[in-house]
Amino acid sequence: MRGGGLALTAACFTGAAALVGIFAVALMRAAFEFTLGFARNERRGGTHPIIEHQAVGYALADAKVAIEATRCFCWRACHAVDVQSPGAQELAIEAKVHGSETAVRVLTDLMRVVGVESYDHAIPLGRLLQDALALPLFGGGNIGVRRRQLHAILKRPEYDPLMTCGEAEV
């Protein structure tokens, strides 16, 4: 269709946005699994594994909550894209922004549990953080592209905030 290039490109970027959120979940899960194992085994000169310390346990709990919330959100966005839901573009953009920015936060929080050793090349956390830092820029930057797209959606006179909830009339 002549003149439909922009719409076609936008549709391709919609699906890609949701997948960036999934990439973020994968990075967070890998970092969490490593850090959980580390916390269960590392004693840091004490008699008990560091997972017994409240600060470490809470950091792991917060990371797990963020991972599961992001996973569910991204699954919802990918499903909306797959079934061509009216709110798919909004959900995909939100999943990309939320997932990529949450991954950076969760990775740095988990690196604090491990400490300076997290930068050791034998430990995966440094590499995972490098990958996570690319996600807010990848597939349309969160600030320059994705938030602008979301802003445009929100400004539409016909915008229905319940569209992504499945509550809006279709």
Name these PLM-found stretches.
Residues 1-68:
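Glycine-rich beta->alpha junctions and the first turn(s) of the following alpha-helix
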Residues 25-32, 60-70, 74, 96-107, ...:
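Alpha-helical transition-metal enzyme core signature, strongest for iron centers
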Residues 3-6, 32, 53, 71, ...:
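Alpha-helix initiation and N-capping motif
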Residues 40, 44, 64-98, 111-119:
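C-terminal helix-coil-helix/basic helical segment that borders enzyme active sites and/or dimer interfaces
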Residues 23, 59-63, 91-95, 117, ...:
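A ubiquitous short alpha-helical element
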Residues 31-34, 38, 76, 109, ...:
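Generic, well-ordered alpha-helical scaffold segments in large soluble proteins
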